[in-house]
From Swiss-Prot:
GO terms for molecular function: ATP binding; GTP binding. Keywords: ATP-binding, GTP-binding, Nucleotide-binding. Displays ATPase and GTPase activities. This is Nucleotide-binding protein Bpro_1300. Belongs to the RapZ-like family. Pfam families: PapZ_C, RapZ-like_N. PANTHER family: RNASE ADAPTER PROTEIN RAPZ. InterPro entries: P-loop_NTPase, RapZ-like, RapZ-like_N, RapZ_C. It comes from Polaromonas sp. (strain JS666 / ATCC BAA-500). GTP binds at residues 55-58.
């Protein structure tokens, strides 16, 4: 079973459609009180893949969900909980473009922009506990098609194992909201200042050759690798399904991309591993 919650405007419907395309039986806006009975009813008809979406309109009942999920897991149900998020600026823009009213917004307020921002911040507060107990997906800078592909890749990972997600990003565009660990690599030599490398990315061999020729780059890779090696088993014992490791540099094009590629290759030999290049994927 996949449970999708998150901020209004973050792409929950897009994620649910992706799961429907992947063969899941999908239910939108299921009241939290019906979660356990619904799953039990589904299992009477034989095991099948189920995806359920809940939103802030069920906020008063959402505190019931974590206990229900634990009960389902104790009964042998495989549960994946995803929380979709985006920064406030992005959510405001999306609501403005679609001219939709936020579920918590007051329509009788003169300053509609302020009312929308207040509604978003209230929603963050109401959904805080669910966010803490779920794998967070930051949709601020990805298109609907990219979100669909990413959701499908997440659910395709072996459920009983910890899945590592390595993500490159540019600090100038903000730290990803879904990051569990953030490593700053802006102190490393920057290929941007090499005319022959500026237009390339960390996926290109010439950039990789340039970076691995510097001892500090190799030291950074080994330090991150050692840190993760030390703590991954503790995360498994904590019943984590996903861990997102974000690597940031100035532009999100060279250094962070190179290290994400290298880390994904290294850890992919032992763990289910996914990788994202936020700035490159954004085009």
């Amino acid at each position: 079973m996949v449970l999708i919650t998150g901020m209004s405007g973050s792409g929950k419907s897009v994620a649910l459609h992706a799961l429907e395309d992947a063969g899941y039986y999908c239910v939108d806006n299921l009241p939290p009180e019906l979660l356990t009975p619904f799953v039990a009813l589904e299992h009477q008809h034989g095991p099948r893949k189920v995806a359920i979406a809940m939103d802030v309109r069920s906020a008063t009942s959402l505190p019931l969900v974590p206990q229900q999920l634990r009960q389902l897991q104790a009964q042998g149900v495989t549960v994946q909980s995803l929380f979709l998020d985006a920064n406030t600026e992005t959510l405001v823009r999306r609501f403005s473009e679609t001219r939709r009213l936020h579920p918590l917004s007051r329509g009788d307020t003169a300053d509609q922009h302020r009312a929308l921002v207040d509604a978003i911040e209230l929603e963050r507060e109401l959904l805080g506990d669910m966010r803490e107990q779920s794998h967070v997906l930051d949709t601020s800078m990805i298109r609907a098609s990219q979100l669909q592909a990413y959701v499908k890749s997440l659910i395709a990972a072996p459920a009983p194992q910890l899945t590592l997600v390595f993500e490159s990003f540019a600090f100038k565009r903000g730290v990803p909201l879904d990051a569990d660990y953030v490593f700053d690599v802006r102190m490393l030599p920057n290929p941007h200042y090499e005319p022959d490398l500026r237009h390339l990315t960390g996926c290109d061999l010439a950039v990789a050759d340039y970076l691995k020729a510097h001892a500090e780059v190799n030291d950074m890779f080994r330090d991150i690798e050692k840190f993760l090696d030390h703590w991954l088993q503790a995360l498994v014992r904590d019943h984590r399904s996903y861990v997102t490791v974000a690597i940031g540099c100035t532009g999100g094009q060279h250094r962070s991309v190179y290290l994400v590629e290298k880390l994904a290759e290294s850890f992919g030999r032992q763990w289910p591993t996914l990788k994202r290049h936020r700035e490159l994927d954004a085009g």
